[in-house]
Design a protein with these regions (language model features):
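Secondary-structure "cap/kink" motif recognition
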Residues: 1-344
């Protein structure tokens, strides 16, 4: 009796599949051992508020953030300007909650496949992160690799991790938000004064003309005075000008003492109904617009700092030069139209 060729092929395929399955599962590189939900950083988890320094490194980029004496997070690489405490606290919380899910590869040749290759490489996709306490003790330290959302073992979110001094890679629960550019870590907010809270704006050039815009008491319009006389200001121009300090932010910042050869554009003084007065000057530097403030001590009241508590930047506006986005600079530049006249 001749053997059935189809049966032989089926048995060979079944044997090959079984052998391959056994080989993969017995290989140290492809262990599917679970980690029993063990915390990755138990010291951080037990006391996350002890974190005092955050170090990040990837592809040659190094960032360091520390807490100052006022417990404000600052960027050591950006003149100790205030960092986004919301972002840093989120990273601390995400790291503290991380748990080991499964053992992964130990083979260096496979590290780049899951993003846990040496972070010092120029083209590295991995990110090194370290959290330290006030005394320098390490609360968390790891290379963070690729992330995913939902997989075939029931994990909603996961991150591949590896300790920089160990070969073993792991799959851990959760995802981590680690921006690689410094600006994303800074608290880029400057001021937030609602336009309806502004009573009067004075703008002038040196040398040059002066103009004043006041909110009228009758119909909510705006009255201006310039070299042409007195008149009602176009509502769109007034709207843009009076929103110049609303949600004001920056794209770069440095200490006032560090300055360049900038061209002065205009001066301004804003008076709010609360009594707050904010003066400043606008400069042009190549393609950037630079903003500097001149605020008297205690000159800013709570109305100007709404939602901005907990950082040193807003009580020390005079110390910094801010490069602001062009669309925000355009709001201030509406003042030039009023100074130049020809609005009637």
């Amino acid at each position: 009796m001749r053997p059935n060729p189809s049966l032989i092929l089926f048995l060979l395929a079944a044997f090959s599949t079984t052998a391959a399955f056994y080989s993969i599962n017995s290989s140290e590189d492809y262990q599917r051992t679970t980690a029993n939900d063990v915390l990755v950083f138990p010291r951080l988890n037990s006391k996350p508020e002890a974190a005092n320094a955050l170090l990040i490194e990837t592809g040659g980029i190094k960032l360091k953030f520390t807490q100052n004496e006022e417990s404000v997070w600052v960027a050591e690489d950006k003149f100790k300007y205030p960092a986004s405490s919301k972002l840093i606290q989120k990273v601390i919380s995400q790291l503290a909650d991380m748990r080991k899910i499964a053992v992964k590869t130990r083979m260096p040749s496979r590290f780049n496949q899951i993003g846990v290759e040496p972070y010092q490489q120029a083209d590295a996709n991995s990110v090194f992160v370290k959290l330290q306490g006030a005394g320098g003790e390490i609360l968390a330290e790891s290379i963070l690799g690729a992330q995913f959302r939902r997989n075939n073992i029931g994990v909603a979110e996961g991150t591949f991790i590896r300790h920089p001094k160990e070969q073993q890679a792991w799959l851990a629960s959760g995802s981590i938000d680690i921006p690689s550019d410094l600006l994303s870590w800074l608290d880029t907010r400057i001021l937030n004064i609602d336009s309806n809270e502004i009573k009067k704006i004075k703008i002038w050039e040196k040398p040059g003309g002066t103009a004043v815009v006041v909110r009228s008491n009758d119909d909510g319009g705006f009255i201006y005075q310039n070299r042409d006389g007195i008149g009602y200001l176009d509502r769109e121009i007034a709207k843009n000008l009076f929103e110049s300090l609303t949600k004001l932010s920056f794209v770069d910042v440095w200490p006032r003492k560090i300055s360049g050869k900038w061209q002065s554009i205009l001066y301004f003084e804003v008076e709010a109904y609360s009594g707050s007065k904010i003066a400043g000057q606008l400069f042009r530097s190549d393609s950037r617009t630079i903003l500097q403030f001149s605020v008297k001590e205690n000159g800013l009241k709570e109305v100007a700092l709404r939602g901005l508590a907990g950082t040193i930047a807003y009580s020390e506006l005079n110390k910094w030069s801010y490069a602001i986005p062009s669309w925000q600079a355009d709001r201030f530049l509406e003042g030039l139209k009023i100074i130049e006249g020809g609005l009637q």
